[in-house]
């Protein structure tokens, strides 16, 4: 019942975002709440020392999106906002459908944080996706490869599995890959999915720098 309830909550979050009138204010509040949630979560990991190196760092794609969206939005890095909005919507939704809670009796803080954090990510990402600019495939490729290379180096150094770049989740256990090859597979899959969604999802404008490139071409 817990997993079903979380999925139903995901649908309600998406519906709620459709009826908000003051979008800019809602996005700012949502991003600030997301930062607070992340701060409390990392404070808990640091305070308890529970799997700090292998699970407590902001190296999962969802956590990167949570922090990346806030930084990019407030720093007015439009290209990164558009990238993390699409990635955050995908990752956040998947996390609410294929639920992977920590092994603590609910309601433990980590599990509560998991639910709230991903709801906020989906809310923020969905709000921003609807106002997004179209980005170029080369940017999707470069950002994804740089991000995943950094995660993969951390995984190898810490013997962790951030981003599932060393070992696939159980739902993809049928894929005969292990080690670094998993990271390559996930990276290619991410690039493909992000490129497709970037093309098919509606967008309001084109980045100014992209306009200039089109004019020069």
Question: Could you say what each language-model-derived stretch is?
Answer:
Residues 97-142:
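A contiguous pocket-lining binding segment that forms or flanks enzyme active sites
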Residues 2-7, 50-62, 83-85:
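Structural signature of hydrophobic alpha-helical transmembrane segments
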